[in-house]
Amino acid sequence: MKIFFLLIIALVSSWLKANEKPNIIIILTDDLGWGDVSYHGGYIPTPNIDQLAQDGMEMNRFYANPVCSPTRASLLTGLHIFNHGVVRPFMNPSAEQTGMPPELKIMPQYLKEAGYQTALSGKWHLGMANEKFLPTNRGFETSYGHLTGGIGYFDHTAAGRLD
């Protein structure tokens, strides 16, 4: 009888373990060189990032575009630049394209459907001229950072206004 209960406990615990969702952390940086992190031989210690790379999965062959907005759109949609239509950074709110097309479903929307909590920290740069482009309307429950391509480090302004 003890063996039967131990077997049941083992099966249930392995089933529960198999149903645990892994944590997903994506770090996307602009202009980060291969050797800028210490686990790739960089001179500046990056122990926390090194630990994440050691314990997690490093995907280091993601090629999309040499500028930020198309790269972010490719990562979030899983589409090539010519399929998602974001071909340049969103710099001018009066330009013909002011944000990533809202009809494109992106990674945080899928993750929310799968029961994940989603958050964005840092640079969005996929549209800010209309509320439909904002990260909190694209699947991120929380967004802490800035919407434009770059801000002042000390005053958090872009183009003379707070971002």
Where are these regions (language model features)?
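Formylglycine-dependent sulfatase
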Residues: K2, L16-D163
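Sec-dependent N-terminal signal peptides
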Residues: I3-V12
